[in-house]
Amino acid sequence: MSSTPNKHADYPRLVADIGGTNARFALETAPCVIEKVAVLPCKEYDTVTDAVRAYLNQSGATGVRHAAFAIANPILGDWVQMTNHHWAFSIETTRQALGLDTLILLNDFTAQALAVTQTSSKDLMQVGGQKPVEFAPKAVIGPGTGLGVSGLVHSPAGWVALAGEGGHTSFPPFDDMEVLIWQYAKNKYRHVSAERFLSGAGLSLIYETLAAKQKAEPAKLMPSEITEKALNCESPLCRQALDIFCAMLGTVASNLALTLGARGGVYLCGGIIPRMLDYFKTSPFRSRFENKGRFEAYLAAIPVYVVLSEFPGIAGAAAALGNHLKNV
């Protein structure tokens, strides 16, 4: 929302990535220049306005007129009720309370998708494929606490991020083992989405299924425990769970690539994959990604990148704000 759209080149701009646990704030002091990043625990502030004011005081920022917040929520209107924290607020009332000319909110994964367009090559690790086709659609998928899914389509005004809830599409099992895991999940949940498996909790669910099948102990493990034991070769069952997780990610990523025609590349965000880069390069991900019968050659050409940048949500919020101010 903007009350005086004429002076839209002003810096610094306030950008934030707000989750259920922490709110990350920063200042964009020039195009694509992010400074003074700070992480504030959400629980220490009664309202989002209180957290913003605390950051502005802490950073010594003055003259901030424009802001964009990426938030772990769908943005469906002026009223925002966070699903994983108690903050609830009106965007317009918050803008007025902070004395801003502009305040826009966007879904956090939409922001991560936009950040892809500003990510330098040093913050990307390629896993197979050839060179991306310039201006072709890009697919963005991010397993973490949940499963974020987006896409980027080029327009005369620049890159447009597709806001959706693709992580909640139905998961398609590939082989007999995945059918068994899918059935185990189906017995626990009414609908088995891709996110049920391609998330931290999903990795635990895959392990739980394998442990139940083999009557192995421990019956359950945390995602970090599974990853650690798998990478340190301490548990064949954990390694199997991680292999299946990566194969499933290959299936879902290739489905998204085919749906979007993502010859501009597939970009993997989220907190899980960057913790196992060496393993991931040779994991079942890439072979499963290309295993699409008649479209194997089509997918073999598509590059996949692991995004390694530290604060993609903040960079994406800055990109969204820049796009907004260009067009008001």
From Swiss-Prot:
Gene Ontology CC annotations of this record: cytosol
Top-level division of the source organism's lineage: Bacteria
Annotated SUPFAM superfamilies: Actin-like ATPase domain
Residue sites binding ATP per the record: 16-21
Coiled-coil positions: none
Subcellular location: Cytoplasm
GO biological process per UniProt: glycolytic process
Catalytic reactions of this protein: D-glucose + ATP = D-glucose 6-phosphate + ADP + H(+)
Keyword Nucleotide-binding: yes
InterPro entries, alphabetized: ATPase_NBD, Bacterial_glucokinase, Glucokinase
EC number: 2.7.1.2
UniProt protein name: Glucokinase
Biological source species: Neisseria gonorrhoeae (strain NCCP11945)
Gene: glk
